[in-house]
């Protein structure tokens, strides 16, 4: 499990990427993309407070803290670089959209934006795996690998979790109308087999002129199918960085 923010801040670098994970997620989710960041770019792979620790650490955090963390991390990169791209997953995409509306952001690379949520049986199965089960297929293995909280079998330690999810639903409602205000290049990817984010979420980008929306037919919320979908994501990530670099 990753327990701290990973940074590469290069003196004199003109471009940077900010990576923001989702609720109960981890910076490890961006492992397929970090090697694609050009060597002359800076990056910050942010660890949100309450992640990388135990169940009670997560309870002690809040949406307001995570939002402010993202803003501060972006401001740090913005102060030192001409170009900043935000790459985000799930809840992190909500903060990315908010930041792009209020601040100069050169590009967004968004994975599974939760504008509309549903809970499929696989989500419950993954929750059990994260509690202490043994993953036996790539979907379960991906869910456990992306999980950003230490396993804890004491159910009392989870008592503070419901407020965090109520806050998440509030953040979704708050962000949904902001999407159509986006005026920056944006690549948004949605998994057709996502167990948490409804594909209805993709419709929110229909009126965003600079948004390119792509559906991933074989992937889920944390699992990205390796033969077709993941290479497509990596190609899109490279293209976004190249597009933003050319704008300089």
Question: Locations of the language-model features?
Answer:
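Catalytic histidine-centered segment of alpha/beta-hydrolase-like enzymes
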Residues: 219-232
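The serine-hydrolase catalytic nucleophile loop
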Residues: 24-34
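Conserved alpha/beta-hydrolase "acid-adjacent" motif
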Residues: 27, 195-201
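Gly/Ala-rich beta-loop-alpha elbow adjacent to hydrolase catalytic centers
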Residues: 88-96
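Active-site nucleophile loop of the alpha/beta-hydrolase fold
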Residues: 109-119
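Active-site nucleophile elbow and catalytic-triad environment of alpha/beta-hydrolase enzymes
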Residues: 161-179
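Short beta-strand/loop motif that positions the catalytic acidic residue
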Residues: 181-182, 188-190, 194
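Conserved alpha/beta-hydrolase
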Residues: 38-55
């Amino acid at each position: 499990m990753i327990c701290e923010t990973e940074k590469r801040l290069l003196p004199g670098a003109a471009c940077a990427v900010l990576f923001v994970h989702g609720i109960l997620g981890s910076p490890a989710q961006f492992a397929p993309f970090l090697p694609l960041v050009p060597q002359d770019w800076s990056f910050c792979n942010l660890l949100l407070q309450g992640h990388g620790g135990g169940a009670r650490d997560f309870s002690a955090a809040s949406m307001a803290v995570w939002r402010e963390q993202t803003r501060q991390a972006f401001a740090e990169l913005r102060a030192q670089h001409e170009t900043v791209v935000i790459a985000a997953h799930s809840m992190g995409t909500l903060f990315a959209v908010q930041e792009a509306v209020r601040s100069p952001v050169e590009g967004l690379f968004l994975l599974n934006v939760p504008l509309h949520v549903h809970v499929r049986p696989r989500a419950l199965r993954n929750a059990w795996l994260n509690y202490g089960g043994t993953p036996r297929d790539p979907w379960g293995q991906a869910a456990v690998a992306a999980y950003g909280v230490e396993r804890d079998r004491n159910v009392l330690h989870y008592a503070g979790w419901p407020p965090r999810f109520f806050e998440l639903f509030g953040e979704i409602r708050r962000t949904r109308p902001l999407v159509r205000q986006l005026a920056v290049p944006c690549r948004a990817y949605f998994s057709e087999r996502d167990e948490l984010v409804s594909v209805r979420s993709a419709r929110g980008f229909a009126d965003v002129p600079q948004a390119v929306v792509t559906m991933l037919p074989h992937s889920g919320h944390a699992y990205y199918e390796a033969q077709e979908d993941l290479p497509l994501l990596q190609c899109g990530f490279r293209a976004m960085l190249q597009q933003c670099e050319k704008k300089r």
